[in-house]
């Protein structure tokens, strides 16, 4: 149902025009699905995923994270506080003037879908709390079947 939801929303928004994916039956969920338990000071460096589409769903987001971004000490020295936020990076990351990013402060029940190849990172927070999210990747069914066949031939 998650692949179907993504495909339906992406189609309505015109986001499937330049992809080979036309309907949800062409997407399959890759295993494993994983749970992220992030505690104070933990973070994920810039990375990307396999497959076509990645998804993250936030199950628990402590209110203290939002407070850090609106009232925290670093708000006095930064126009863009980043405590506990997720940032997607595009362009030539590391090249001045040729890259950008999109930063969100997750809320409970937020679901984000994005291209699996898109670099992203998660910033640390100071709150003595735990944030919980679930992540999954979707692959193109035909490509995944070819990959499995190739693995079997080795």
What do the predicted segments below correspond to?
Residues 133:
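Acidic, two-metal ion nucleic-acid-processing modules in DNA metabolism proteins
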Residues 1-50:
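Signature of the catalytic double-stranded beta-helix
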Residues 120:
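Glycine-rich nucleotide phosphate-binding loop and flanking beta-alpha elements
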Residues 137:
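An acidic/histidine-cluster motif and surrounding catalytic segment
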């Amino acid at each position: 149902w998650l692949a179907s939801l993504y495909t339906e929303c992406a189609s309505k928004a015109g986001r499937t025009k330049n992809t080979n994916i036309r309907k949800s039956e062409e997407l399959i969920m890759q295993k494993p699905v994983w749970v992220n338990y992030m505690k104070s000071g933990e973070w994920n460096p810039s990375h990307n995923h396999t497959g076509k589409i990645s998804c993250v769903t936030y199950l628990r987001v402590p209110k203290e994270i939002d407070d850090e971004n609106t009232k925290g000490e670093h708000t006095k020295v930064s126009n863009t506080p980043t405590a506990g936020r997720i940032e997607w990076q595009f362009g030539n990351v590391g090249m001045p003037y040729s890259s950008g990013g999109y930063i969100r402060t997750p809320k409970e029940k937020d679901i984000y879908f994005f291209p699996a190849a898109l670099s992203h990172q998660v910033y640390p927070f100071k709150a003595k709390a735990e944030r919980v999210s679930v992540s999954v990747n979707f692959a193109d069914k035909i490509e995944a079947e070819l990959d499995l066949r190739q693995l079997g031939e080795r």
